[in-house]
Amino acid sequence: MEQLCKRYVHTPAAFIQNIVANTKRTTLATQLSVEKAKKKVPKTALKKKLNSRPKERLPNWLKLNDVFNIHYEKPSNSDINKVNRFFNKAKVEFEWCAASFDDIPENPFLNKKSHKDILKDHGECGTTLIDTLPEVIFLGGTNVGKSSILNNITTSHVSRDLGSLARVSKTTGFTKTLNCYNVGNRLRMIDSPGYGFNSSKEQGKVTLQYLLERKQLVRCFLLLAGDKEINNTDNMIIQYIHEHGVPFEVVFTKMDKVKDLNKFKKKVMSSGLMDLPTLPRLVLTNSLTSSTSPKRFGIDLLRYVIFQSCGLIL
């Protein structure tokens, strides 16, 4: 009887202990599984998130910036980012316009109250820096997109609103004078009258005189429409600035409108640009956004070349 009682007394206890032990093991296994799952979730989620992010679509013509400039060192991403930050944040001011070379003021700041304030803020050192700013000029045929390029350079890379720094017009030859813009008190950009149709002799004279006599000029950027042929006037300008030793680069605009890239490459190779001893850099851009070019590609490289031309790349 005593043994029978012991049997009924101890059996439930052992049974309960067994259940508790199994429960602990099950709980521990579950916790380990949960912990393991938690560790995997972030990586899996991150991977899915990265894979779900749409890839940026790059136009095929953009690769030609590397192909045509193989003799130049490709700028680092760090340098590109620094230059982009400068242009995106720099204050841009219209300084002067000139219909003749004699109209170009030697000290444009001294005649304006706002500019006097700038000089006062910077002191004597600031005056020296401002008065010796390097200048780059943009040259091109009528309606080639000079003003649009200026807006692209001086506004945010991702912005579709190009602003009104340099007025854009569909009327050919809109820019009638040399227009000067101060960019962050580090450099000046000059927008010139377009040559060709609807241009005047006076406009051509002031531009050519500026190219030959302006001491502050460090680089000329010749703009050619990518979707058009290089005409006789373009070739005359190229020959002129080359023979007179004016340092220049070539910017192809409206590349998003180029339908046949092979034909475009043949055009460039047969133009003689690649054979010039000075070997100008060729920069391909699209100044306006479209379905084929949703961003303004090539502008970051153009900004870098401008900065480099002005001796501002450290």
UniProtKB/Swiss-Prot annotation:
Give the record's PTM text: Sumoylated upon ethanol stress.
Gene3D superfamilies cross-referenced by the UniProt entry = P-loop containing nucleotide triphosphate hydrolases
Matching entries from PROSITE patterns are given as: G_ENGB (PS51706)
Extract the Pfam families matched here.
MMR_HSR1 (PF01926)
Biological process per Gene Ontology, one example term: mitochondrial translational elongation
Can you tell me which residues bind GTP? 140-147, 173-177, 191-194, 253-256, 290-292
Where does it localize?
A: Mitochondrion
CDD domains on file: YihA_EngB
Task: State the needed cofactors, names only.
Answer: Mg(2+)
- Which InterPro entries does the entry link to? EngB_GTPase, G_ENGB_dom, GTP-bd, P-loop_NTPase
One term of GO molecular function: guanyl nucleotide binding
EngB-type G domain boundaries: 132-312
Where along the sequence do coiled-coil regions lie?
none
Q: Where does Mg(2+) bind?
A: 147, 175
Keyword annotations:
GTP-binding, Magnesium, Metal-binding, Mitochondrion, Nucleotide-binding, Ubl conjugation
Described by its record, this protein's role is as follows: Component of MIOREX complexes, large expressome-like assemblies of ribosomes with factors involved in all the steps of post-transcriptional gene expression.
Q: State the similarity comment.
A: Belongs to the TRAFAC class TrmE-Era-EngA-EngB-Septin-like GTPase superfamily. EngB GTPase family.
- Could you give the subunit structure recorded for this chain? Associates with the mitochondrial ribosome.
Q: What is this protein called?
A: MIOREX complex component 8
Gene from which the chain derives: MRX8
